[in-house]
Swiss-Prot record:
It is a single-pass type I membrane protein. Residues 31-227 are extracellular. The modification Phosphoserine is found at residue 323. GO terms for molecular function: identical protein binding; ubiquitin protein ligase binding. CDD domains: TNFRSF3. Self-associates; dimerization and trimerization are promoted by lymphotoxin (LTA(1)-LTB(2)). Associates with TRAF3. Associates with TRAF4. Associates with TRAF5. Interacts with Aedes aegypti lymphotoxin beta receptor inhibitor; the interaction reduces dimerization and trimerization of LTBR induced by lymphotoxin (LTA(1)-LTB(2)). TNFR-Cys repeats lie at residues 42-81, 82-124, 125-168, 169-211. The chain crosses the membrane at residues 228-248. It comes from Homo sapiens (Human). Keywords: Apoptosis, Disulfide bond, Glycoprotein, Host-virus interaction, Membrane, Phosphoprotein, Receptor, Repeat, Signal, Transmembrane, Transmembrane helix. This is Tumor necrosis factor receptor superfamily member 3. Receptor for the heterotrimeric lymphotoxin containing LTA and LTB, and for TNFS14/LIGHT. Activates NF-kappa-B signaling pathway upon stimulation with lymphotoxin (LTA(1)-LTB(2)). Promotes apoptosis via TRAF3 and TRAF5. May play a role in the development of lymphoid organs.
Amino acid sequence: MLLPWATSAPGLAWGPLVLGLFGLLAASQPQAVPPYASENQTCRDQEKEYYEPQHRICCSRCPPGTYVSAKCSRIRDTVCATCAENSYNEHWNYLTICQLCRPCDPVMGLEEIAPCTSKRKTQCRCQPGMFCAAWALECTHCELLSDCPPGTEAELKDEVGKGNNHCVPCKAGHFQNTSSPSARCQPHTRCENQGLVEAAPGTAQSDTTCKNPLEPLPPEMSGTMLMLAVLLPLAFFLLLATVFSCIWKSHPSLCRKLGSLLKRRPQGEGPNPVAGSWEPPKAHPYFPDLVQPLLPISGDVSPVSTGLPAAPVLEAGVPQQQSPLDLTREPQLEPGEQSQVAHGTNGIHVTGGSMTITGNIYIYNGPVLGGPPGPGDLPATPEPPYPIPEEGDPGPPGLSTPHQEDGKAWHLAETEHCGATPSNRGPRNQFITHD
């Protein structure tokens, strides 16, 4: 359809004028700039504006990295200020404070990947080998990944640390022989590439085994050889036990000897005198007198038990010293005829060439007069070669003449006989008395 008027010369002249008029009309209408009134409590830009209910107006929000330092009013918009160091605000906000930056806690398994700024908080993630176990808007706690057993590997994920391992089997021609959360399956070794031959094929848990082409295979042990290797040591042990038991039964003295060795006290350990369990040694069956101790026998009556005073008692029949000839003439007693000392007797008993003394023994250690000096006597003092003067002699030392000391008169005693006169008395006995 053609418009002849619009294409005519007058139409072309009025066109720009009409467009300019419409532009002026559009510019004359007022635009809504915060703060502005809102009748339905909604603002045109919800991300950057907010509704202030006290004044019923829409106000501007503060951009990231700032906070509200002065609230808006009907005549003034919101005033913002930059966050201080170590604080942040990530979004458009109308907060009056900034949030504090927090470090990544290594105790909870976190590590830092980006520092904190005024527009962004600290960026944290789980440490290697761990996954996030607690998530609340962000990860707050990490735990160790589970191990994948041999023959498997952990499935790869787009986001590391978001979940626990999910183990999958190794592909054909690959193996994995450890238990690890991060181990990966490896391809089997190709023996021909190394100039070797395959000895054992690879599996999902082990690699291929290669060998030298000239190396012979080890012989496999048959079932018979394996049975002999088990039964021969067992039969040898049973034979040894049988021989030992036969020797033990045929020689019972071995048991007694072993028991005596076990009961013997170690060297240097003596009997305990306080224990009170000491017993005198028993007499030898063939030589009783040689091992009889010089101790009171339990059957003897002690002076303390009878209440009588103790006194040394020796039997009257103490044998005197005998000559060798007399000893040879004594009859020799047979071992069976030798007897022990009778209980309850004290004294000296000689039996079978031995002497047994029971009772108290008193030894006198005085000098012997008139006999030859003994081996323990002191040597005699030699006689001086010159005379010793008497005590009190005023003269010089030398030879002195003996003389009679003055004393009482001499008296003669007479013996009288019956019928005799003094004239015819018999011989007289002279007694010298010294006054």
